[in-house]
Amino acid sequence: MVAVAILAAGRGTRMKSNLPKVLHRLGGYSLVERVLNSCQLLNPSRQLVIIGYEGEQVRDSLQQLDSLEFVEQKEQLGTGHAIQQLLPHLEGFQGDLLVLNGDVPLLRPQTLENLLNIHKTHRNAATLLTAHLPNPKGYGRVFCDNNNLVTQIVEDRDCNAAQKQNHRINGGIYCFNWQQLAAVLPKLSADNDQKEYYLTDVVKFLAPVMAVDVEDYLEITGINDRKQLAMANGILQNRVKDHWMAQGVTLIDPDSITIDDTVELQTDVIIEPQTHLRGKTSIGKGSRLGPGSLIENSHIGDNVTVLYSVITESQVASGCRVGPYSHLRGQAQIGESCRIGNFVEIKKSVIEQKSNVAHLSYLGDATLGEQVNVGAGTITANYDGVQKHRTIIGKGTKTGANSVFVAPVTLGEEVTVAAGSVVTHDVPDRALVIARQRQRIIEEWKKTIESKK
């Protein structure tokens, strides 16, 4: 049985932000969400989030997650003080406690699983995650015997010249036997320059304490400022892109492409430069995206082409061509084999298969049947100043260039709309609608004007 405690009480002053540090986003999740995700493979019996600065904001951001317990640290007096706040909450708990930092978001689930397994196998009082860094400056050094049992942890500022040659550092990730830890937590002292209670100080009261090296030291990258957040994003992006290229996805210029790790891609997808996939997005096999496109929280079917376009909260079925310079938003649903072309905006509309909206159009709150052809410059006037209204256009209808449909209005099937029409009333099946001023020519108009000068 294992409980997880996540340290999420700090403000993160170096972020220069009103937002708590752990709520800054990395890919599709906040930092603290990523930490929570990393430990789900362990199936923890309890998950406790220690909150402090803007604690209600942290709590509200995680309210969609089940089984979280929130523990308040009213004063931020160090990591040891944070864990002391768990004493009344874990009274009588008989298992192990895994301690994670809410600002260390790149841990792999397998790393934590390995840490816990070694901890249990050796029946350690404490097991900590360590790493060998090329440049360990600023990190506490961990000293071990030949059996990886910890003999000493020395903070960087307290290391002498010889100790600084040790590149094995403390990653700040711990697994404790809770009952043994609970017995020594009251012994912690704030007798140091920072006047804080350090969790590392419990090591001198516990035995055995073992160190376990992380396979990739980048996993323990912590976030303290915007530069480190950007570095972590680069590490995450490399992981994600390496994964998808190994699965049969082509990235034309990986450095210019971003893909959230919440995105799902099928084989033979091709992603062109300056394309960004975000949120809960899925892309079907053989689709070609970009260059210069943004797709967020959307589903794209098989063999779709998206060129210089923005698609958010929408669905595009197989065989469609979108762009250049199209904007789909607000639950737009595009059926199979449709063409959505240059400078077209579609909002909260359903367009059925084999329909074309090729140029310079706005369709909002509309439903188009199959094989509708929308002429250039077609607009649905869906807002009366108070509420939105729907436009319904039946199967096989053709709208002329520069048409306006003043909603609510319904056009039947196979209707022909003359160019320049402003349609305000329903139109029956197979009708021709001409809703424009009859052309009038006044000859010699120029001469009339000149005579008045």
Curated annotation (Swiss-Prot):
Binding site for UDP-N-acetyl-alpha-D-glucosamine: 7-10, 21, 73, 78-79, 140, 155, 170, 224, 329, 347, 362, 373
Biological process, per Gene Ontology: cell morphogenesis; cell wall organization; lipid A biosynthetic process; peptidoglycan biosynthetic process; regulation of cell shape; UDP-N-acetylglucosamine biosynthetic process
Gene this protein is translated from: glmU
Active site: H359 (proton acceptor)
Known partners and oligomeric status: Homotrimer.
Catalytic activity of the protein: alpha-D-glucosamine 1-phosphate + acetyl-CoA = N-acetyl-alpha-D-glucosamine 1-phosphate + CoA + H(+); N-acetyl-alpha-D-glucosamine 1-phosphate + UTP + H(+) = UDP-N-acetyl-alpha-D-glucosamine + diphosphate
First-level EC class: transferase
Annotated region (N-acetyltransferase), positions in chain: 248-453
MF terms in GO: glucosamine-1-phosphate N-acetyltransferase activity; magnesium ion binding; structural constituent of carboxysome shell; UDP-N-acetylglucosamine diphosphorylase activity
Record lineage: Bacteria, Bacillati, Cyanobacteriota, Cyanophyceae, Oscillatoriophycideae
Cofactor remark from the record: Binds 1 Mg(2+) ion per subunit.
Taxonomic superkingdom: Bacteria
Residues bound to acetyl-CoA: A376, N382, Y383, A419, R436
Protein name (database record): Bifunctional protein GlmU
Annotated localization: Cytoplasm
Signal peptide residue numbers: none
Pfam families tied to this protein: Hexapep (PF00132), NTP_transf_3 (PF12804)
Region annotation Pyrophosphorylase: where it falls in the sequence: 1-226
